[in-house]
């Protein structure tokens, strides 16, 4: 049994047709699994189903042996699942550090040590911690989004097309950072269109 699993999932949006049908995905801690396919193939839908943003007609989602199929997306975050959407979802009018702090909304402890760990993973963020995110490059904004997702100390990190809209050089750098995160024993589930890049990691 894998650490994080979507098992025989079937479902769609509202009363519309099923977008995923009998789909299974699994990933273990310290592993990266990429969901590959062309636009419109349902890759992001699979991820949304595992996060609880899509109602399943059948199938289940399990983390560390616990069935979380009936949990809300917020409760799934409390179970250790973090998500970075394709839109990056950063607050451009706030500083880097303020963006990271927004990721700590579920924490009731002192999270400054976690911010320091994130700065160790993404050194450029320490250098620019007081700078507005709107002034950063696309690759740096993606690092902010990744860092914010790590503020809850997740066991599972889901990334929806993390390299969308960035240059090949920035893409390589982002994948290097994703590999660093994997080495911290996080299970990473990633939607990616670039098969070559996905297979390289």
Predicted regions and their residues:
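Glycine-rich phosphate-binding loops of nucleotide-dependent enzymes
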Residues: 2-201
């Amino acid at each position: 049994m894998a650490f994080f699993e979507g098992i025989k999932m079937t479902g769609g949006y509202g009363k519309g047709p099923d977008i995923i049908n009998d789909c299974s995905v699994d990933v273990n801690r310290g592993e990266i699994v990429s969901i590959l396919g062309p636009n419109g193939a349902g890759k992001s839908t699979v991820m949304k189903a595992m996060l609880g943003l899509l109602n399943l007609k059948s199938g289940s989602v399990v983390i560390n042996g616990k069935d979380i199929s009936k949990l809300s997306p917020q409760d799934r975050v409390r179970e250790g699942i973090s998500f970075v959407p394709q839109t990056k979802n950063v607050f451009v009018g706030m500083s880097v550090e303020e963006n990271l702090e927004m990721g700590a909304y579920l924490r009731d402890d002192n999270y400054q040590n976690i911010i320091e760990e994130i700065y160790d993973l993404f050194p450029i963020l320490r250098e620019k911690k007081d700078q507005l995110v709107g002034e950063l490059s696309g690759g740096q904004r993606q690092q902010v989004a990744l860092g914010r997702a790590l503020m809850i100390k997740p066991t599972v990190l889901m990334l929806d097309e993390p390299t969308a809209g960035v240059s090949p050089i920035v893409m390589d750098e982002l994948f290097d950072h994703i590999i660093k995160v994997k080495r911290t024993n996080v299970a990473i589930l990633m939607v990616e269109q670039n098969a070559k890049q996905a297979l390289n990691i």
